[in-house]
Structure formats: structure tokens, C-alpha cells
């Protein structure tokens, strides 16, 4: 047993998609940056309420997708019945994650977004761009939604009214978001020109 599910702190790991083949395998959309560990054989995943356990029997990748085989799901019909189910895993200890320089998407919300030293825009290091207000899932990668410190007029609409951009979406990849400091509550950005309005 893994303890009272109501006492577990659960984090969304994946959403089950379509069945793969005839033997009960399912494709999954990832919400974790550590699928190798989450999907090890005998790993336990949970429904959102923690009441239902899903035990990983095996996992593999195929064309950049992860495919899971869960215990008790042995044919295509059973696999198709799980389409849309979201899988949750136990959250790691926060202190251990800080030491390992790891974080969950929810940890990024509220962080100040600053320009990295030596950024490609040639602007001062530490210049505050805004604050992270959301982490948006997209098919390619997660996006950081940043509320800009200063709204930017980017043009005019057909009525001659100013178009004001108050937020920017930045792909959450290391090249654009090189540093994250949860203790100091900021992250750094190295955006190309045109990605963030006004820069």
C-alpha cells in the first residue's frame, strides 16, 4: 500500500489518449519532464481524486510519443475506455527538488521574469520583463504566460484604436528560459527579438 490516497499530494503526470495496438497499450500526453522515472514498471499512478490506482506494467516510446501498458488493461476495448483519463503521481519532496534544481509548473507561477546576462537583445541583465501568471500546455511544449510590467502598444485595429499587448507567451525551453531560482523567486529569459512585445 502507498498510504491513504487522501493524504497524498498528487501532481498531474499525463493524460491518456488513444489505444495503441490490440494488447491494451495506450498513448499518453505528458505533463512531466521525468517520464522515464514516472513510468518505470510497477510505478503507481492515481486518478485525480487518488481513489483509483493504475500500476505501470511497461512503457516505451514510439515516434516521440510515450506508450504505457497498465496492469489489468489487456485489450483494445479496455484501453479505449481510458481515453481522456488523467494520471497523477505522488509529488516529490520540495526540498529535495530544490537541491536537484527541479520544479513543477505550478512553482513557476508568480516568479519575476528578468532578462539574462548577455541576452541576445543586448539589453541590461536583470531588466524586469514581467511576472509569470500561467503555464499553458501546447502540443509542442509548455508556454510561460508572462504579464508584462509595461503594456505595449503594438499597432491599431480597423477602428483606429490602439492594440495593447499586456502579456507574452514564451516557450518553456532551456534556450529561452536558462535559469530558474525558486528561492529568490525569479527566472531569466533570453528571448529573440519580436517574441516579447516591446523588446
UniProtKB/Swiss-Prot annotation:
Protein's cellular compartments: Cytoplasm
Record's function text: An accessory protein needed during the final step in the assembly of 30S ribosomal subunit, possibly for assembly of the head region. Essential for efficient processing of 16S rRNA. May be needed both before and after RbfA during the maturation of 16S rRNA. It has affinity for free ribosomal 30S subunits but not for 70S ribosomes.
Keywords: Chaperone, Cytoplasm, Ribosome biogenesis, rRNA processing
SUBUNIT field: Binds ribosomal protein uS19.
Xref: InterPro entries: PRC_barrel-like_sf, PRC_RimM, RimM, RimM_N, RimM_N_sf, Transl_B-barrel_sf
Domain of life: Bacteria
Source taxonomy: Bacteria, Bacillati, Actinomycetota, Actinomycetes, Bifidobacteriales
Cytoplasm found in the keyword field: yes
GO molecular function per UniProt: ribosome binding
Domain statement: The PRC barrel domain binds ribosomal protein uS19.
Disulfide bridge partners, by residue number: none
Organism: Bifidobacterium longum (strain DJO10A)
Ranges for domain PRC barrel: 100-195
Any single GO CC term annotated in Swiss-Prot or TrEMBL for this entry: cytoplasm
Example GO BP: rRNA processing
Name assigned to this protein: Ribosome maturation factor RimM
Family of the protein in this entry: Belongs to the RimM family.
Amino acid at each position: 500500500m502507498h498510504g491513504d490516497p487522501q493524504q497524498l499530494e498528487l501532481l498531474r503526470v499525463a493524460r491518456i489518449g488513444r489505444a495503441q495496438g490490440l494488447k491494451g497499450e495506450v498513448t499518453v500526453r505528458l505533463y512531466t519532464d521525468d517520464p522515464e522515472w514516472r513510468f518505470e514498471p510497477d510505478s503507481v499512478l492515481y486518478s485525480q481524486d487518488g481513489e483509483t490506482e493504475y500500476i505501470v506494467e511497461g512503457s516505451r516510446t514510439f515516434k516521440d510519443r510515450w506508450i504505457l501498458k497498465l496492469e489489468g488493461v489487456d485489450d483494445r476495448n479496455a484501453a479505449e475506455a481510458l481515453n481522456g483519463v488523467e494520471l497523477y503521481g505522488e509529488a516529490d519532496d520540495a526540498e529535495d527538488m530544490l537541491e536537484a534544481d527541479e520544479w513543477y509548473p505550478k512553482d513557476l507561477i508568480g516568479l519575476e521574469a528578468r532578462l539574462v546576462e548577455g541576452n541576445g537583445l543586448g539589453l541590461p541583465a536583470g531588466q524586469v520583463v514581467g511576472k509569470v501568471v500561467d503555464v499553458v500546455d501546447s502540443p509542442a511544449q509548455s508556454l510561460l504566460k508572462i504579464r508584462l510590467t509595461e503594456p505595449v502598444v503594438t499597432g491599431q485595429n480597423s477602428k483606429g484604436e490602439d492594440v495593447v499587448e499586456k502579456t507574452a507567451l514564451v516557450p518553456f525551453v532551456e534556450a529561452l528560459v536558462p535559469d530558474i531560482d525558486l528561492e529568490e523567486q525569479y527566472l531569466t529569459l533570453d528571448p529573440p527579438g519580436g517574441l516579447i512585445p516591446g523588446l
